[in-house]
Amino acid sequence: EAHEGVYSRLGQEVIAAFLQNRSLHTLYLSGTPYNIQRMFDTREVFHWDYTMEQQAKQQWTSLHPNTTNPYEGLAQMNILTYDISDKMRSLTKADGLNFAELFRTETTVDNTSRFVHEADVRKFITLIGKDSNDKTQPYANAYLQPSLNHTLWYVPGVMAAKSLAEILGEDSPTNPFSEYTIVNVAGNGEAGSDRLDIYEQTRFERSALERVKTAVTQHDKTITLSCGRLTMGVSIPEWNAVLMLA
Protein backbone atom coordinates (compact mmCIF):
# COMPACT_ATOMS: atom_id res chain seq x y z
CA GLU A 1 0.00 0.00 0.00
CA ALA A 2 1.65 3.20 -1.18
CA HIS A 3 1.39 6.51 0.63
CA GLU A 4 3.75 9.33 1.63
CA GLY A 5 5.62 6.75 3.71
CA VAL A 6 7.32 5.40 0.58
CA TYR A 7 9.62 8.43 0.80
CA SER A 8 10.69 7.62 4.37
CA ARG A 9 13.86 5.73 5.23
CA LEU A 10 11.93 2.57 6.10
CA GLY A 11 9.85 2.83 2.93
CA GLN A 12 12.95 3.15 0.77
CA GLU A 13 14.51 0.13 2.48
CA VAL A 14 11.42 -1.99 1.80
CA ILE A 15 11.31 -0.95 -1.86
CA ALA A 16 15.03 -1.60 -2.27
CA ALA A 17 14.57 -5.11 -0.88
CA PHE A 18 11.86 -5.82 -3.44
CA LEU A 19 13.94 -4.48 -6.30
CA GLN A 20 16.75 -6.92 -5.51
CA ASN A 21 14.52 -9.66 -6.91
CA ARG A 22 14.39 -8.59 -10.55
CA SER A 23 11.85 -11.26 -11.45
CA LEU A 24 9.23 -9.36 -9.45
CA HIS A 25 6.93 -6.66 -10.76
CA THR A 26 5.98 -3.88 -8.35
CA LEU A 27 2.40 -2.69 -7.95
CA TYR A 28 1.75 0.43 -5.86
CA LEU A 29 -1.81 0.54 -4.51
CA SER A 30 -3.09 3.74 -2.93
CA GLY A 31 -6.40 5.32 -2.06
CA THR A 32 -4.72 8.71 -1.54
CA PRO A 33 -1.94 8.90 -4.14
CA TYR A 34 -1.79 12.69 -4.41
CA ASN A 35 1.78 13.11 -3.16
CA ILE A 36 3.34 10.13 -4.95
CA GLN A 37 1.92 10.53 -8.46
CA ARG A 38 5.09 12.25 -9.64
CA MET A 39 6.90 8.93 -9.22
CA PHE A 40 5.11 7.51 -12.26
CA ASP A 41 4.61 8.17 -15.94
CA THR A 42 0.96 8.57 -16.96
CA ARG A 43 1.20 5.29 -18.89
CA GLU A 44 2.01 3.52 -15.63
CA VAL A 45 -1.09 4.71 -13.78
CA PHE A 46 -4.46 2.95 -13.55
CA HIS A 47 -7.09 5.32 -12.22
CA TRP A 48 -10.31 4.24 -10.49
CA ASP A 49 -12.22 7.05 -8.80
CA TYR A 50 -15.49 7.73 -7.03
CA THR A 51 -17.36 8.62 -10.24
CA MET A 52 -16.32 5.37 -11.93
CA GLU A 53 -17.33 3.45 -8.82
CA GLN A 54 -20.82 4.97 -8.78
CA GLN A 55 -21.27 4.34 -12.50
CA ALA A 56 -20.33 0.70 -12.01
CA LYS A 57 -22.79 0.50 -9.12
CA GLN A 58 -25.66 1.84 -11.24
CA GLN A 59 -24.85 -0.27 -14.31
CA TRP A 60 -24.14 -3.56 -12.58
CA THR A 61 -27.65 -5.02 -12.63
CA SER A 62 -28.17 -4.40 -16.35
CA LEU A 63 -24.71 -5.65 -17.29
CA HIS A 64 -24.61 -8.59 -14.85
CA PRO A 65 -28.19 -9.72 -14.15
CA ASN A 66 -28.83 -12.24 -11.39
CA THR A 67 -25.44 -11.60 -9.78
CA THR A 68 -24.62 -9.79 -6.55
CA ASN A 69 -23.63 -6.17 -7.03
CA PRO A 70 -20.23 -5.76 -5.30
CA TYR A 71 -20.67 -1.98 -5.27
CA GLU A 72 -24.10 -1.99 -3.61
CA GLY A 73 -22.82 -1.01 -0.18
CA LEU A 74 -20.73 1.93 -1.38
CA ALA A 75 -22.38 5.18 -0.36
CA GLN A 76 -23.39 7.94 -2.72
CA MET A 77 -21.85 11.30 -1.90
CA ASN A 78 -23.99 14.43 -2.07
CA ILE A 79 -22.28 17.81 -2.50
CA LEU A 80 -24.25 20.87 -1.38
CA THR A 81 -23.17 24.48 -1.86
CA TYR A 82 -24.57 27.53 -0.11
CA ASP A 83 -24.56 31.14 -1.27
CA ILE A 84 -24.43 33.34 1.82
CA SER A 85 -22.70 36.29 0.19
CA ASP A 86 -25.69 38.56 0.81
CA LYS A 87 -25.52 37.76 4.53
CA MET A 88 -21.74 38.19 4.88
CA ARG A 89 -21.18 41.14 2.55
CA SER A 90 -18.14 42.60 4.32
CA LEU A 91 -16.11 39.42 3.70
CA THR A 92 -17.47 38.49 0.28
CA LYS A 93 -15.46 38.89 -2.91
CA ALA A 94 -16.46 38.31 -6.54
CA ASP A 95 -15.87 34.55 -6.21
CA GLY A 96 -17.74 34.18 -2.92
CA LEU A 97 -17.14 34.28 0.82
CA ASN A 98 -13.46 34.42 1.75
CA PHE A 99 -13.12 31.82 4.51
CA ALA A 100 -9.41 32.53 4.98
CA GLU A 101 -10.26 36.12 5.87
CA LEU A 102 -13.32 35.19 7.94
CA PHE A 103 -11.25 32.85 10.11
CA ARG A 104 -8.10 35.00 10.22
CA THR A 105 -6.62 35.17 13.71
CA GLU A 106 -4.31 37.47 15.62
CA THR A 107 -2.23 37.09 18.77
CA THR A 108 -3.34 39.21 21.71
CA VAL A 109 -1.13 40.92 24.31
CA ASP A 110 -1.51 37.95 26.66
CA ASN A 111 -0.22 35.63 23.89
CA THR A 112 -3.58 34.03 23.12
CA SER A 113 -5.25 33.79 19.75
CA ARG A 114 -8.55 35.29 18.69
CA PHE A 115 -10.45 35.93 15.48
CA VAL A 116 -9.90 39.31 13.85
CA HIS A 117 -13.53 39.20 12.68
CA GLU A 118 -14.97 37.48 15.75
CA ALA A 119 -18.38 39.13 15.39
CA ASP A 120 -18.61 37.85 11.81
CA VAL A 121 -17.53 34.35 12.87
CA ARG A 122 -20.28 34.28 15.49
CA LYS A 123 -22.74 35.57 12.89
CA PHE A 124 -21.70 32.75 10.55
CA ILE A 125 -22.10 30.13 13.29
CA THR A 126 -25.59 31.43 14.05
CA LEU A 127 -26.43 31.45 10.35
CA ILE A 128 -25.66 27.75 9.84
CA GLY A 129 -26.92 26.66 13.27
CA LYS A 130 -30.13 24.92 14.26
CA ASP A 131 -32.00 28.15 15.06
CA SER A 132 -31.11 29.93 11.83
CA ASN A 133 -33.86 31.93 10.16
CA ASP A 134 -32.68 30.41 6.88
CA LYS A 135 -34.05 26.87 7.05
CA THR A 136 -32.00 25.77 4.03
CA GLN A 137 -28.81 25.98 6.12
CA PRO A 138 -27.41 22.56 7.10
CA TYR A 139 -28.14 22.43 10.83
CA ALA A 140 -31.46 24.29 10.44
CA ASN A 141 -32.66 22.01 7.65
CA ALA A 142 -35.20 19.53 9.01
CA TYR A 143 -34.20 16.99 6.34
CA LEU A 144 -30.42 17.27 6.75
CA GLN A 145 -30.04 17.94 10.46
CA PRO A 146 -30.69 14.37 11.67
CA SER A 147 -27.78 13.24 9.49
CA LEU A 148 -25.32 15.71 11.02
CA ASN A 149 -24.75 14.18 14.43
CA HIS A 150 -21.05 13.58 13.72
CA THR A 151 -19.30 15.86 11.24
CA LEU A 152 -15.85 17.01 10.20
CA TRP A 153 -15.26 20.73 9.72
CA TYR A 154 -12.26 21.59 7.54
CA VAL A 155 -10.89 25.02 8.49
CA PRO A 156 -8.03 27.18 7.10
CA GLY A 157 -5.42 26.61 9.80
CA VAL A 158 -4.34 25.52 13.26
CA MET A 159 -5.09 28.80 15.03
CA ALA A 160 -8.45 29.07 13.29
CA ALA A 161 -9.34 25.60 14.61
CA LYS A 162 -8.24 26.53 18.13
CA SER A 163 -10.25 29.76 18.22
CA LEU A 164 -13.29 28.14 16.61
CA ALA A 165 -13.20 25.28 19.12
CA GLU A 166 -13.38 27.80 21.96
CA ILE A 167 -16.44 29.52 20.49
CA LEU A 168 -18.25 26.28 19.59
CA GLY A 169 -17.52 24.93 23.06
CA GLU A 170 -19.13 27.82 24.91
CA ASP A 171 -21.88 26.78 27.31
CA SER A 172 -24.30 29.51 26.33
CA PRO A 173 -27.96 29.58 25.29
CA THR A 174 -26.93 31.67 22.26
CA ASN A 175 -24.54 28.97 21.04
CA PRO A 176 -26.42 26.76 18.53
CA PHE A 177 -23.77 24.04 18.95
CA SER A 178 -23.65 23.91 22.75
CA GLU A 179 -24.93 20.32 22.75
CA TYR A 180 -22.07 19.13 20.52
CA THR A 181 -18.76 17.77 21.79
CA ILE A 182 -15.95 19.60 19.99
CA VAL A 183 -12.82 17.63 19.04
CA ASN A 184 -9.96 19.76 17.74
CA VAL A 185 -7.40 17.54 15.99
CA ALA A 186 -5.57 20.37 14.23
CA GLY A 187 -2.95 20.30 16.99
CA ASN A 188 -0.07 22.77 16.79
CA GLY A 189 0.87 22.08 13.20
CA GLU A 190 3.40 19.48 14.25
CA ALA A 191 2.27 16.71 11.88
CA GLY A 192 2.91 18.95 8.89
CA SER A 193 6.43 19.84 9.99
CA ASP A 194 9.35 18.71 7.86
CA ARG A 195 11.29 18.18 11.07
CA LEU A 196 9.23 15.14 11.98
CA ASP A 197 9.87 11.76 10.41
CA ILE A 198 7.12 9.39 9.32
CA TYR A 199 7.08 7.64 12.72
CA GLU A 200 6.31 10.87 14.60
CA GLN A 201 3.71 11.93 12.05
CA THR A 202 2.01 8.55 12.35
CA ARG A 203 1.97 8.86 16.15
CA PHE A 204 0.18 12.20 15.97
CA GLU A 205 -2.33 10.79 13.46
CA ARG A 206 -3.10 7.78 15.66
CA SER A 207 -3.57 9.96 18.73
CA ALA A 208 -6.02 12.20 16.86
CA LEU A 209 -7.89 9.21 15.48
CA GLU A 210 -8.29 7.66 18.94
CA ARG A 211 -9.65 10.93 20.32
CA VAL A 212 -12.29 11.10 17.59
CA LYS A 213 -13.26 7.44 18.00
CA THR A 214 -13.64 7.92 21.75
CA ALA A 215 -15.75 11.05 21.27
CA VAL A 216 -18.18 9.53 18.75
CA THR A 217 -18.56 6.47 20.96
CA GLN A 218 -19.25 8.38 24.16
CA HIS A 219 -21.27 11.32 22.80
CA ASP A 220 -24.36 11.56 20.62
CA LYS A 221 -23.20 14.65 18.75
CA THR A 222 -19.66 15.69 17.83
CA ILE A 223 -17.87 18.18 15.61
CA THR A 224 -14.26 17.45 14.64
CA LEU A 225 -12.13 20.42 13.60
CA SER A 226 -9.17 19.82 11.29
CA CYS A 227 -6.99 21.69 8.82
CA GLY A 228 -5.71 18.50 7.20
CA ARG A 229 -5.25 15.80 9.81
CA LEU A 230 -7.44 12.68 9.44
CA THR A 231 -8.42 13.65 5.89
CA MET A 232 -6.37 11.00 4.07
CA GLY A 233 -6.16 7.26 4.61
CA VAL A 234 -8.62 7.31 7.52
CA SER A 235 -12.16 5.97 7.79
CA ILE A 236 -14.51 7.10 10.55
CA PRO A 237 -17.92 5.55 9.75
CA GLU A 238 -19.78 7.86 12.13
CA TRP A 239 -18.84 10.92 10.09
CA ASN A 240 -21.67 11.50 7.66
CA ALA A 241 -20.82 15.02 6.49
CA VAL A 242 -17.86 17.32 5.91
CA LEU A 243 -18.15 21.10 6.03
CA MET A 244 -15.49 22.67 3.81
CA LEU A 245 -14.72 26.00 5.46
CA ALA A 246 -11.38 26.65 3.79
Where in this protein do the model-derived segments appear?
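SF2 helicase catalytic motif II
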Residues: 1-28, 32-33
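Switch/connector loops and helix/strand junctions flanking conserved nucleotide-binding motifs
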Residues: 4-6, 35-40, 88-91, 191-194, ...
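Conserved catalytic network of the ASCE P-loop NTPase/AAA+ motor domain
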Residues: 17-23, 70-73, 143-146, 214-219, ...
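Interdomain helical connector at the RecA1-RecA2 junction of SF1/SF2 helicase-like NTPases
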Residues: 25, 37-152, 165
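Conserved C-terminal RecA-like helicase domain
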Residues: 101-226
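A short beta-strand element within the Helicase C-terminal
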Residues: 222-226, 232-246
